[in-house]
């Protein structure tokens, strides 16, 4: 998958998790930050958070700048761990959910 396809896959995973865990305010906040569909310019609400996600994903891209589903999940997991450890977000349940996929 390209980065844009990987991003779409991540959004689907996170939205699926939120449907099952509606009270996960930490993840809802992060999802809102990386959402590129709110504004007409298709830019994320918080470009820094979006860049953090991209940085974590880029560690796993292959020589063709593509990502497998497993690589996307690893990058997403690393991103969530980063936000848990650096910013105190309560993301343990979501990290476990991602790790089981």
Enumerate the predicted regions with their spans.
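Charged, low-complexity interaction regions
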Residues: 17-25, 65-66, 83-92
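Amphipathic alpha-helical binding modules
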Residues: 48, 70-101
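Generic structural signal for hydrophobic core residues of well-folded globular domains
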Residues: 13-21, 34, 57-60, 79, ...
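Short, charged early-sequence alpha-helical segments and their helix-coil boundaries
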Residues: 38-71
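N-terminal interaction modules that seed assembly of large macromolecular complexes
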Residues: 21-47
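Short terminal alpha-helical segments
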Residues: 3-31
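Short, low-complexity cationic-aromatic patches
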Residues: 1-5, 68-69
């Amino acid at each position: 998958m390209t980065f844009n396809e990987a991003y779409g896959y991540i959004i689907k995973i996170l939205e699926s998790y939120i449907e099952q865990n509606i009270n996960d305010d930490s993840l809802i906040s992060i999802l809102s930050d990386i959402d590129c569909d709110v504004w007409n310019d298709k830019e994320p609400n918080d470009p820094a958070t979006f860049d953090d996600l991209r940085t974590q994903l880029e560690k796993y891209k292959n020589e063709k700048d593509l990502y497998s589903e497993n690589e996307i999940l690893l990058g997403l997991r690393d991103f969530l761990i980063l936000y848990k450890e650096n910013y105190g977000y309560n993301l343990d349940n979501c990290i476990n959910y991602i790790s089981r996929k």
